[in-house]
Amino acid sequence: MKTFACTFFLSFVLVFSIYADTAYPVIVVAQDGSGDFITIQDAINSVRDFTPVPRVIHIKKGIYYEKVEIPSWKCDITLKGDGPEETLIYYDDYASLRRMGTFRTYTLQIRGNRVTLENLTVENRAGRVGQAVALHVEGDCVAVRNCRLLGNQDTLFTGNENSRQYYDRCYIEGTTDYIFGPATCWFDHCILHSLSLIHISE
C-alpha cells in the first residue's frame, strides 16, 4: 500500500512539474490598475468555463481583502503571486458570524480541478473566535507551492474524500484542527506551526 501511494504521488508531482514549466496565457491582477483586473475574483470570472487552455493569473504585489471562489467549472487555473511576503489574500469570516458555519468561512475556496497556487499567502484574520478557514480545497489535482496558509482554528480544510492535493514548501499555522478534512494529501518540505500547545496526530 505504501509503495502504491508513493508511486501515485510521484506521478502526481511529475505531472504538475511539467504543467508548471509550460507557458500559458497570463492574466494580470494589480491594485494600481496596471494589469487586466483590480480584483482576483474578476480575473477568475474572466476565464472561460472548462477552458481548453490552462490560464495563469499573476497577482502582483499587494494586500487583497477578498473572499475568493474558484467554482467547479473554472479548471486548469494557476494563481501565482510575487512571493508569500509580497502577495497576501485575506478575509475575516468565522463560523458564528451570521451563523454561517465552518465551511463558508473560507478566504479562498477551490472547487475546480487542476488548480495551482504559487508564491502567495492566504490568511483568515478573524482571530481566536472559533472556526475560521483560510484555504478550503475540494477540487482534484490541486497543488499549493511556496505558500503561507495562516489562521487559527481550521486554517486548512482538505475537503472531499476524492480530492488529491499536493503541498510543496508551504508554511501552515493555526491552533485547533488547523489541518483537517478527508482528502488524500502529500506535504513535501512543509512547516507546520502550532500557535498553541496542541498535539499533531499523524
Residue ranges with predicted function:
Residues 7-17:
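Bacterial N-terminal signal peptides
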